[in-house]
Amino acid sequence: MRRRAARGPGPPPPGPGLSRLPLPLLLLLALGTRGGCAAPAPAPRAEDLSLGVEWLSRFGYLPPADPTTGQLQTQEELSKAITAMQQFGGLEATGILDEATLALMKTPRCSLPDLPVLTQARRRRQAPAPTKWNKRNLSWRVRTFPRDSPLGHDTVRALMYYALKVWSDIAPLNFHEVAGSAADIQIDFSKADHNDGYPFDGPGGTVAHAFFPGHHHTAGDTHFDDDEAWTFRSSDAHGMDLFAVAVHEFGHAIGLSHVAAAHSIMRPYYQGPVGDPLRYGLPYEDKVRVWQLYGVRESVSPTAQPEEPPLLPEPPDNRSSAPPRKDVPHRCSTHFDAVAQIRGEAFFFKGKYFWRLTRDRHLVSLQPAQMHRFWRGLPLHLDSVDAVYERTSDHKIVFFKGDRYWVFKDNNVEEGYPRPVSDFSLPPGGIDAAFSWAHNDRTYFFKDQLYWRYDDHTRHMDPGYPAQSPLWRGVPSTLDDAMRWSDGASYFFRGQEYWKVLDGELEVAPGYPQSTARDWLVCGDSQADGSVAAGVDAAEGPRAPPGQHDQSRSEDGYEVCSCTSGASSPPGAPGPLVAATMLLLLPPLSPGALWTAAQALTL
């Protein structure tokens, strides 16, 4: 049974004098208090109130401002609007304009509303009938290109081609580029107000939008904010990934609206790169939605002319000229602060960054992602973590740094954190590693040459600990990281090497230690410091074979992430249809599950 913090009663119902008040005042009253007996929470700042009201109206949660009524709202309507936004965004549904809600409102996103926009005259929503193209062959062209971008015209066109191909690969739609002025899908890079009713707002905020199919002159047109720093395989892990945003917007252009499903490409918030354009596949629920509109693509039309795919990436002299950030580590020449299996995937943390491997050990990106952009709620000044693990009792993720720890539900920090590590009966000073051993379902914490055994189900430390390391013969007495993997084995990391202990065993498997960089992070022997000679196949006992590069995917000296780390897929790993590929989303708790807002939300 989950332990939940006690919660007071909700806000009291409004009395006659509160039933209708000007919205800013009502926000202060409704959002500054959590319960009738609780102490008032800090009142939102005036600029936050203004942001909240404008944002909720802009994206369909509240009617737009009406000067004839003074924009009056009831407390109930306002609380419902905030609750709906929180549910759609994967936050705890409190109905309160708290810090997490404001942070999500400030996250870059698509310009289109999440819900059918309300009006003052009609407060009941009626979901519009889905629109779709009544033809199968659609033309497209890039009418205007980004003006001050390191991405060349050919790269932009290539990214548009592959983003459209994501949809035509599974649905009976054929996209072809045209050079003339007439095209079904016109693509523009614009700034500020560009006369379509969806003005852009500078860097961040709204980054792009597209129009649904129909008979209007803008049907299918797709616009990107030219004030954004558009990137592709950026070396500094910053900017807006153009391919990821384009896939989302072209979903609108063929008729799909926003959804709250956790790993859908059609969630409204920007979540970062989605991987290699030549290998990216849509999450399952997005496939189902487009199949419902157009049916399943069975074969290529015999009358369709073959179109030569553009090359990716572009030559080196047309890539980003921005210097790489000095604090970004290289995966092939470092040890890691923490390693964890989360939702069946491997996360390697170093400094403010992390790398991610899917269930079948595909490296999502050769470049690391920023930790704070993925795990919402970690302090911005946090420059590293000590240990991370996923609790087996409730599948929440625990981060440790020094004397404090944080608990996350999916990508969002739980209320009330950070808390002291003394909650675990651990001494002050932090830990070196943490992992849950599959053999006994206990969590082990390591510090220097000591280890503790903890029961996450009862939230108590087992008696008799700490004990002297190591429990497993052959494992170093001091560790950097530890993790259990989907194959049932436990993996221990120190420096640039790792040790493998098979499920239920108390000693290291033969042939270890081996190179972490080579076997997990797709580094060659010449790249990984301290790498060792190849061993036999993992099925025979020692380690997995070295990672493999797809040789056809190295172009113009530019390393492309179509790579697989050493081991074959663990038993029961999902196939490519259900494996989550978006960099900034957690996969579902069970393979193939449609992880909807009612279950566990995170875009």
From Swiss-Prot:
Glycans are attached at residues 137, 318. Hemopexin repeats lie at residues 333-378, 382-427, 428-475, 476-523. GO terms for molecular function: enzyme activator activity; metalloaminopeptidase activity; metalloendopeptidase activity; zinc ion binding. The gene is MMP17. This is Matrix metalloproteinase-17. It comes from the Eukaryota. Binds 1 zinc ion per subunit. The active site is at residue 249. Expressed in brain, leukocytes, colon, ovary testis and breast cancer. Expressed also in many transformed and non-transformed cell types. Endopeptidase that degrades various components of the extracellular matrix, such as fibrin. May be involved in the activation of membrane-bound precursors of growth factors or inflammatory mediators, such as tumor necrosis factor-alpha. May also be involved in tumoral process. Cleaves pro-TNF-alpha at the '74-Ala-|-Gln-75' site. Not obvious if able to proteolytically activate progelatinase A. Does not hydrolyze collagen types I, II, III, IV and V, gelatin, fibronectin, laminin, decorin nor alpha1-antitrypsin. The keyword Disulfide bond applies. It holds the Pfam family Hemopexin. Disulfide bonds join 332-523. Residues 1-35 form the signal peptide. The conserved cysteine present in the cysteine-switch motif binds the catalytic zinc ion, thus inhibiting the enzyme. The dissociation of the cysteine from the zinc ion upon the activation-peptide release activates the enzyme. Residues 36-125, 566-603 form a propeptide. Zn(2+) binds at residues 110, 248, 252, 258.
